[in-house]
């Protein structure tokens, strides 16, 4: 029987494929611990888009400066290991509902879309470095990689 379902936020995915990131060891540890506890780690098409955006954006604009081919290679790493939560009409409708009911504006629309996918696919936890971004959504538990890694120490 599988353990807890987690959506892995883009900020975690980006650190997972970049060994020179200062948070890389923490992310690797948190993911390994989650998998040892039979957690099912998930992602969405939105995560891939955010990941791709950062990977292919120039270094001088706070990106990784990778080619699309290298971004594809790195995305394939997590796509092989994680479960895709597919987009659907239900996800779109839940997202639209969240935008209005939670008075969402600006870049917050992206996190609302992740929450919509989580709700439709019954995922209650998101592994993220930005817990506050998900605080407005009841029933969603934002888990920092540090707290997940500390759970089993």
Feature-to-residue mapping (PLM):
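Short, well-structured N-terminal submotif of metal-dependent ribonuclease cores
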Residues: 1-43, 58-69, 149-153
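Alpha-helix/helix-capping structural signal
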Residues: 11-12, 46, 113, 132
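Short beta-strand segments at enzyme active-site cores
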Residues: 42-45, 128
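Short acidic, glycine/proline-enriched helix-loop-strand junctions
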Residues: 74-92, 96, 103, 134-153
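Helix-adjacent hinge/juxtasegments
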Residues: 54-86
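Active-site neighborhoods of divalent-metal-dependent phosphate/nucleic-acid chemistry enzymes
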Residues: 83-129
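Acidic, PIN/NYN-like endoribonuclease modules and their adjacent C-terminal/linker elements
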Residues: 1-5, 112-153
